[in-house]
């Protein structure tokens, strides 16, 4: 199925950025497009919107594709509070340029409580599972929406920024 979501990312300083995300499921993977206004968008191939397999920036950069070459993923034995999900990824740009360095990243998410998905957005059904994640100096609070198979980011914090994401629209096409 396919679905789209638009939200406003708000900073503590009152700055707002409207972001529109479109997802479709293909062969168990999420094909995702994030549009940051009219000029810039990112195409991604993801697992559950947690683990990135491929990304391409459109409207900025040289059109390279960042591909995940190796992924070491540790899934929790159950989705019980306190369990941990982690992924260590090794990525490379294609086509490669002489100045490119290989990239590595580690995502760690601690499983929190289960709660009704409608608390994230009124039209959602079923349950959501709270995830507290860290990756490359960013901490994020996410909700894994079981019916959609996707982890929506509700809040993200780094040493420089703090964003709270307010979902405006969420349309699911089944």
PLM regions with names:
Residues 1-59, 65, 91-174:
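Acidic, serine/threonine-rich low-complexity disordered tracts
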Residues 1-4, 76, 80-88:
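Glycine-centered loop/turn motifs
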């Amino acid at each position: 199925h396919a679905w789209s979501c638009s939200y406003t990312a708000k900073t503590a300083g009152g700055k707002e950025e409207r972001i529109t995300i479109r997802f479709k499921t293909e062969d168990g993977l999420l094909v995702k497009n994030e549009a940051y206004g009219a000029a810039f968008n990112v195409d991604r191939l993801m697992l559950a919107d947690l683990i990135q397999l491929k990304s391409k920036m459109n409207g900025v950069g040289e059109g390279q594709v960042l591909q995940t070459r190796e992924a070491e993923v540790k899934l929790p034995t159950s989705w019980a509070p306190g369990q941990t999900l982690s992924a260590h990824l090794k990525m490379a740009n294609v086509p490669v340029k002489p100045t490119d360095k290989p990239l590595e990243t580690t995502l760690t998410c601690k499983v929190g409580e289960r709660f009704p998905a409608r608390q994230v957005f009124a039209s959602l059904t079923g349950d959501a599972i709270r995830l507290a994640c860290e990756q490359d100096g960013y901490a994020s609070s996410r909700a894994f929406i079981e019916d959609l198979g996707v982890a929506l980011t509700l809040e993200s914090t780094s040493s420089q920024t703090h964003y709270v994401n307010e979902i405006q629209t969420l349309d699911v096409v089944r």
